[in-house]
């Protein structure tokens, strides 16, 4: 048990060192102008490793405050929800750790002005991040077809990761959420939930995006005590941030964004009087940190299965 604690501490210290390097590297990178589909030049805070960023935020440092300010209130909800210093990827998961670092350092497209109904160029989605997932060499690999937000979709993913890691000892196992349908609403930040009144869209079953909340009872739980019935690997930990900290990846769906934006327009939920292309861009720009946007989930699923991911529903 003591050895596990030392390993978690060692990995977190290394993560903080890597953050300083990657943060400097990212700040020095020049932005490219993107002429595709009316998109402006883009950058994204997600290129900074999320776990290291949260460690800075927790210290109250000037750099951390600047990052939080740049993220905006909505994305700050996601950041503030994650217990600083928690590294929940299993010990020995070298391939998963490398993938997580590569994904964190990969730029996302989040400053669109307009997006079309059908995406026709890789610059319009997170193609580099998706390629990393398609070429991941760890195993086993599983993709969950998640559509219904009322189902225990996060619980199923958590159970799968837990049994793979602790029972079958597959440290490099990865679970991906192929997110569409109403589940896709969980991938929007607080800005979208407030601006477009998503609680009403979901029949007031949720007052806000509670999928980003980490319950208080697990915040101080030990990552070393994996059998704690109320701990970080228990049903109490069914939330997006903790699953992401365990290496899970959530795919976004442009088709779901386009169709949902059309539904908002039809119902008059368009406070800024945007066009369909502009409203879809607004939703795209406010996906939570860490999401990998695809041109369409049902089209991406065959690519994932061809790449060795087992389909689960």
PLM feature spans:
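N-terminal export signals
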Residues: 33-46, 52-78
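Glycine-rich, aromatic-bearing surface loops/beta-hairpins
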Residues: 265-313
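Histidine-anchored nucleotide/phosphate-binding helix
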Residues: 152-168
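N-terminal secretory signal peptides
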Residues: 1-48
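C-terminal segment of N-terminal export signals and the immediately downstream linker at the start
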Residues: 68-126, 130-133
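A glycine-rich helix N-cap at a beta->alpha junction
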Residues: 197-223
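Acidic/histidine-rich, surface-exposed loop or edge segments in extracytoplasmic proteins
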Residues: 130-147
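Acidic helix-start/capping segments at beta-turn-to-alpha-helix junctions
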Residues: 170-192
């Amino acid at each position: 048990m003591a050895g596990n604690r030392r390993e978690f501490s060692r990995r977190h210290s290394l993560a903080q060192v890597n953050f300083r390097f990657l943060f400097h590297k990212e700040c020095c990178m020049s932005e490219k102008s993107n002429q595709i589909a009316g998109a402006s030049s883009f950058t994204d805070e997600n290129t900074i490793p999320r776990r290291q960023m949260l460690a800075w935020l927790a210290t109250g440092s000037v750099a951390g405050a600047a990052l939080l300010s740049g993220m905006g209130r909505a994305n700050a909800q996601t950041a503030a929800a994650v217990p600083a210093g928690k590294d929940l990827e299993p010990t020995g998961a070298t391939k998963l750790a490398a993938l997580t670092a590569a994904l964190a350092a990969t730029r996302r497209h989040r400053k669109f002005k307009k997006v079309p109904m059908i995406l026709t160029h890789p610059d319009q989605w997170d193609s580099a991040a998706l390629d990393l997932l398609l070429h991941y060499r760890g195993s086993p690999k599983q993709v969950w077809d998640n559509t219904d937000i009322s189902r225990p979709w996060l619980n199923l993913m958590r159970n799968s990761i837990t049994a793979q890691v602790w029972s079958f000892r597959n440290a490099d196992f990865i679970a991906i959420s192929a997110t569409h349908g109403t589940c896709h609403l969980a991938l929007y930040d607080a800005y979208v939930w407030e601006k477009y009144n998503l609680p009403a869209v979901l029949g007031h079953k949720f007052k806000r995006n509670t999928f980003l909340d980490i319950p208080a009872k697990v915040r101080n739980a030990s990552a070393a005590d994996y059998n704690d019935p109320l701990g970080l690997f228990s049903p109490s930990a069914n939330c997006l941030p903790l699953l992401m900290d365990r290496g899970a990846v959530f795919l976004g769906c442009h088709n779901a964004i386009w169709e949902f934006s059309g539904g908002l327009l039809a119902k008059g939920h368009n406070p800024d009087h945007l066009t369909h292309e502009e409203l879809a861009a607004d939703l795209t720009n406010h996906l939570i940190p860490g999401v990998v946007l695809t041109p369409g989930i049902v089209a991406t699923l065959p690519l994932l299965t061809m790449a060795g991911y087992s389909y689960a529903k």
